[in-house]
Design a protein with these regions (language model features):
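A conserved nucleotide-sugar
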Residues: 80-82, 97-126
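Conserved donor-binding/catalytic core segment of Leloir-type glycosyltransferases
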Residues: 63, 67-94, 100
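Short alpha-helical segment that forms part of, or immediately flanks, the ligand-binding pocket
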Residues: 128, 150-155, 169
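Acidic donor-binding loop of glycosyltransferase active sites
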Residues: 132-145, 158
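Helix-loop-beta element that forms the nucleotide-linked donor phosphate-binding surface
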Residues: 28-33, 37-39, 44-63
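Membrane-proximal helix-turn-helix segments that form the acceptor-binding/catalytic region
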Residues: 4, 12-37
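Short hydrophobic beta-strand element within catalytic cores of glycosyltransferases
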Residues: 159-166
C-alpha cells in the first residue's frame, strides 16, 4: 500500500519518479517483458502484485547461519546495548533519525541500564562488529519487512525493532513466530 510513504518527509519527489516518471516507465517495461519477478521484500511484492500477479513471487532474503552463528546473550543483563546504524544520506528515508531521538530519550531516562552504539556511515565490516556487540538492533522504521541487517541480527540472537508488519508474516504464511518488535512511525509506539 501507499500508507508508509506518507510518513517519510520530503519523499514526494522520489515517489513521483517511481510512480509516473521515467523510472516508472523503465520498470514497467522490464516487468512486462520478464518471465517472472522475484520480490525479496513484502513492499516489492505488493507493488508488483496488482499488475503482475502471475509473475510476482515472494522469495525471502536468504541468510547463511554458518556465517552468522548465534551468540550467547545473558537472559537478564545488567545493561542493554542498543545498536543503531545511520547512513547520513538515507537517514530520513529509513527513519533512523526518529528512532535515534526516542532511543536517546530512553538513555536519558535510564542511564544506568540503556547504552547506545551508534554507527554513522561506517564501512560494513565495522558496522557488523558494532552490531554483534549489542543486544538490540533498531532497524528501519518505515519498512514492512526486515532487510539483511535485521535478518543477520536475528541470526546472531539480537532482538530486532523495526519493520515486522502482520502483512509480511501473512505473505510468508507465518501465524505464530513473529520475532520482530514492530514499531509504527509514532514516537509513542
Amino acid at each position: 500500500g501507499d500508507s508508509f510513504n506518507t510518513y517519510i518527509p520530503g519523499n514526494e519527489k522520489t515517489i513521483q519518479e517511481w510512480m509516473t516518471g521515467e523510472k516508472a516507465e523503465i520498470n514497467k517495461k522490464m516487468a512486462e517483458e520478464a518471465n517472472g519477478i522475484s520480490c525479496c521484500l513484502y513492499e516489492y511484492y505488493i507493488s508488483y502484485y496488482s499488475e503482475f500477479k502471475e509473475k510476482a513471487k515472494y522469495l525471502p532474503l536468504p541468510i547463511n547461519l554458518q556465517e552468522h552463528p548465534l551468540r550467547n546473550i545473558p537472559k537478564y543483563p545488567e545493561q542493554v546495548q542498543f545498536f543503531i546504524g545511520i547512513q547520513k544520506d538515507r537517514n530520513e528515508l529509513k527513519g533512523t533519525d526518529r528512532m535515534l531521538n526516542v532511543l536517546q530519550k530512553l538513555a536519558r531516562d535510564y542511564p544506568d541500564i540503556v547504552k547506545i552504539a551508534k554507527a554513522v556511515s561506517v564501512p560494513y565490516q565495522e558496522y557488523k562488529q558494532m552490531m554483534y556487540g549489542s543486544d538490540i538492533l533498531l532497524d528501519q522504521l518505515y519498512s514492512y519487512t526486515p532487510g539483511m541487517n535485521g535478518l543477520i541480527a536475528m541470526a546472531k540472537g539480537l532482538v530486532v525493532i523495526g519493520g515486522g508488519e502482520p502483512e509480511m508474516y501473512d505473505l510468508m504464511g507465518e501465524q505464530e513466530n513473529r520475532p520482530i518488535i514492530n514499531v509504527l512511525p509514532d514516537e509513542q509506539d
